[in-house]
Amino acid sequence: MKIFSLYIEKYMKFEKQEIKFNSENISKSKEDFQKELFGKMNITLFCGLNGTGKTSILSFMAKIFRYLQRFRERIPSDFKIHYSIKKENKEYDIKLLKKDSKIIISINDDFQNQIMEYDAKKGKYIEDKSSDLKQVTYDDIKFYLPNNILVLGFDIAYEGISYSYNYYGDRLIEYSNLQKTYMKTAAATYTSLGILKFLYLINYNKIFKKILNIKFSPFVDIYFRYLAKSGEYEEYYYEEFWEKYTILEESSIRKINLEKIFNNRELFKKLMFLIENEIIYINEYYIEKNFKKIKINQMSTGEKAFLYHLFFIMANIKENTIIIWEEPETHLNKLWSKQLIPLLTLLCKDLNVHFLISSHETVLINSLFSNQILLLKDSTIDFPNFETFLTNENEIISNISEKIEYNLFEEYIIKKLNISKQEELKVLLNNIGDSFLKFLIYQKLK
């Protein structure tokens, strides 16, 4: 899954705006270097000051796929999106556009397909008899769409993006409301698979464990949903089977030791099957701090949100997934923010996916190459004109942020510099960090 470009006719502050996701000036050697680090995954980070339109672009992208089958009037502008997907060992070049209320798809440059809109009340697709284009159903072209779109966003911009419980149609969007994740105190069916995959990976991958620097307990609490039974693996539904792996039992919850299960590949596959089919779900997991086991509701807001986001992604990510993630650094300390891109790379480099991220965080920016970053300013969207990968923070701030003409504290020091005596200047010198102002004070004391 690789997005090449997005054209927006008129939406929010954008009018006749084309956004290119790939620089045409990247050298072959740089491309090869990036592939060593990022593998098959693609990533684009949108950065810029508040109000430059980062969220507008990402939420618009989500709305394209949310309303492609039904409610097309809710796609707020005509558009054209160009991407490629790989399925069944073939690569397909796709152009999807909306023009004059028509949705048209081009597959390998065949522009003869108009996607009919589905009318749920009539239970059928509605043919556009005024059109000369070949009419196809959403089901006909679903193969050429992303397998799913994961959205980790905020309520206002993504209002209505999730599906109602009785929605009839394809559910292409998986939505995680960022505000609500800060309040979650327990796991559930929709993250259980992600928790299991995550704990399995951290159990065996030393690099992953080193990057994350969190000690996870091998124990989880599981809950049995008897009403969800089906024929396959029936012998593994019963709590009697899991008794030999149980550490503690409280009511309908059992604490089990995952290390024993991870060492038995067949048993691990069966547990994964039961979780995928919502027969068992993980109700609680633990990290270890100061030799104590900490439950979800005892974790900090940042720990809880960060882990939940990773579990959500791991539970839902597939080949040809688009992941839209708004400000992933929210509530993270600098160390975790710095490790986020390497962590995603370790998790996803073998998958053909595309991450779309909005962020102001310098340690995310310098984890990426300049052709993976789009800098939004008042009237332009372009790649940074300097190399961002592993550059220092000051270089990023001076090149990406607008220059601040006035700073109250700096003005105060400059005034003191001009009127203070030697002893006062020495006090200033000892209380200011390394900077150009400190250099000026030092010069004054000479």
Regions found by a protein language model. Name each.
Residues 1-250, 378, 410-446:
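P-loop NTPase switch/coupling surface
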Residues 143, 189, 252-255, 261-269, ...:
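Low-complexity, intrinsically disordered regions enriched in charged/polar residues
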Residues 1-71, 82, 86, 278-413:
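Switch/communication elements of ASCE P-loop NTPase nucleotide-binding domains
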Residues 228-299:
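Long, low-complexity, polar/charged, intrinsically disordered or flexibly structured peripheral segments
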